[in-house]
Design a protein with these regions (language model features):
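N-terminal helical cap/lid subdomain that shapes the substrate entry/recognition surface
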Residues: 1-78, 90
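A short, structured active-site edge motif that brings together acidic residues
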Residues: 29-30, 114-130
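Short, acidic loop-to-helix structural element flanking the phosphoryl-transfer center
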Residues: 67-96, 106, 133
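Surface-exposed amphipathic alpha-helices with a cationic face
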Residues: 81-89, 140-141, 157-161
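Conserved phosphate-coupling serine/threonine residues in phosphotransfer and NTP-handling enzymes
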Residues: 98-100
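Conserved Lys-Pro-Asp/Glu-containing loop-to-beta segment of HAD-superfamily phosphomonoesterases
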Residues: 130-157
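Acidic, Mg2+-coordinating phosphoryl-transfer loop and its flanking beta/alpha structural elements
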Residues: 150-184
């Protein structure tokens, strides 16, 4: 993956700047932040970190991940493209709502030719890092239902509940046990 190396390089920089104390951070802890928006992630991981460092670290992680995407290091789960093609061929309108930054969205859109499947890719940065439960209300105004939400984190389940939609939970091996309890 591209997130962990980007995070580790950024964390090393924070320790070199004496903004954070050096400590061992396991892969499982790092993976646990996947699906969080950057503000939520840094406020969870290092709530005491000065805001200017949080912003710099967030930019650094994002920039490092975008570089890796452009070097073709990002990969999708096996079968994802085939499933998206099948859904599109059946006439479904597909949109993405991600807690990512705009630069990450743009890099993925271009790298994977996502316009083949998706009508729109919403990123939370473009909405001031508001919660998905708020952003989804804008999607509802733009696209008529019914809706089905597919996701891998608690934020996605909350989003589905906010728009009164069924939810399919995907277990990718990160997140907390029971986080997707209540998935349809």
């Amino acid at each position: 993956g591209i997130y962990e190396p980007a995070f580790r390089e950024t964390y090393q920089w924070l320790t070199e700047q004496k903004a954070a104390e050096e400590r061992e951070i396991g892969s499982a802890e790092i993976a646990g932040w996947l699906g969080f928006n950057s503000k939520e992630m840094w406020n969870t991981f290092l709530p005491e970190l000065d805001q200017s460092y949080k912003e710099q670290a967030s930019r650094m992680v994002g920039d490092l991940m975008v570089r890796q995407i452009r070097k073709h290091k990002a990969v999708w789960y096996p079968g994802a493209e085939e499933m998206l093609t099948a859904l599109k061929n059946r006439g479904y309108h597909l949109v993405i709502l991600s807690n990512c930054k705009a630069s990450y969205r743009e890099a993925h859109w271009k790298e994977f030719g996502m316009e083949r499947w998706f009508d729109h890719f919403y990123d939370c940065e473009s909405y001031g890092f508001r919660p998905k439960t708020e952003i989804v209300q804008e999607i509802i105004r733009e696209y008529s239902g019914p809706y089905l939400v597919v996701g891998d984190r608690r934020q996605d389940l909350e989003c589905a509940r906010a728009c009164k939609s069924p939810f399919i939970g995907c277990l990718y091996g990160y997140g907390e046990k029971g986080e997707l309890n209540g998935a349809d």
